[in-house]
Amino acid sequence: MESRSDDMKQQRHDVVIVGGGAAGLSGALTLARARRSVLVIDAGKPRNAPASHIHNYLGRESTPPGELLAIGRGEAAGYGAEIVEGRVASAERLPGEQGFRVATEDGRSVEARRLLVTTGLVDELPPVPGLAERWGREVLHCPYCHGHEVADRPIGVLATGGFAVHQALMWRQWSEDVTLFRHTGPEPTDAEYEELAARGVAVVDGEVTGLEVADDRFTGVRLAGGPVIPREALVVQARFVARSAVLESLGLVPVAQEMGGEVIGTYIPTDPTGATEVPGVWAAGNVTRLTEQVIGAAAAGLMAAGAINGDLIAEDTRNAVEARRRG
């Protein structure tokens, strides 16, 4: 993998970044350009790996996810950032103001003055056979990420909660042929039925038991009892679970995020710059903002990196003043 190795060249850095996606690499690029020593530890398991292209990224529209990461690694490494492959198991604060020690699952450790955690999230899909295999291809959740690519095609929406009606009405913007499959979701209210009917969204009762696939293409939804409803895309509500183990090892606790009165996942709270409740620790990207797209995650990495550099400058200045006073 370009600009990555298994070896850590030094054992202490200004900043260790856990996670090498858009947020982490953006933070690494910013900090390296600020002449900070930066180490990125990346497990190589990006959330958007199943997707064929990235969208809504100005200047990089329709870039394959792997290509964007390779470009980002090269850019960050070009300014001196070190990028290694590995999975971080935990982090701990060192005594005094010495920073943190980060431990990987394979037994390596490294120290840092500051931490930036950009570990993203995991999409937990409804327990319907076939969803995971088609995830990111024809099984979708974000209309802004995938809507244009399935425009004017037959689209299904799998209801597992009350948010499905909102999803169906939203995806109607991209296709006139939208069907809401009731599945295990609640029955729509009278007002919701009226809205769906007004927009021409069909509602089908019955549990979905699987997907029909032919020639490696999703072709329809199979209902209990055998009927198959032809569809070319299926929208689901995944549960977004922050990859927060590293942050939890430092004492941070993930909280539930609600949308439309439903819990859609968990995240780690931060301030607008990405600072967590643990001094010296920042988080950026989907681990703290569940609905962030790639370009937003990159922007969050930049924001956090700027705040981290400012914090380090303040510490460097305090240390310089103390040294001057000591003569």
Predicted stretch roles:
Residues 70, 76-104, 109-112, 175-267, ...:
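A Rossmann-like FAD-binding core segment of flavoenzymes
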Residues 137-144, 157-167, 188-190:
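Active-site glycine-rich loop that binds ribose-phosphate moieties when present
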Residues 1-15, 83-153, 233, 263-273:
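FAD-binding core/adjacent interface of flavoenzyme oxidoreductases
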Residues 19, 112, 118-120, 125-127, ...:
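Short, well-ordered coil/turn residues at beta-beta hairpins
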Residues 32, 77, 133, 172, ...:
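Anion (oxyanion) recognition and catalysis
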Residues 133-149, 240-295:
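FAD-site-proximal beta/loop scaffold in flavoenzymes
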Residues 13-70, 153-154, 163-187:
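Beta1-alpha1 glycine-rich phosphate/pyrophosphate-binding loop at the start
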Residues 28-29, 165-167, 284-327:
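A conserved FAD-binding loop/helix module that cradles the flavin
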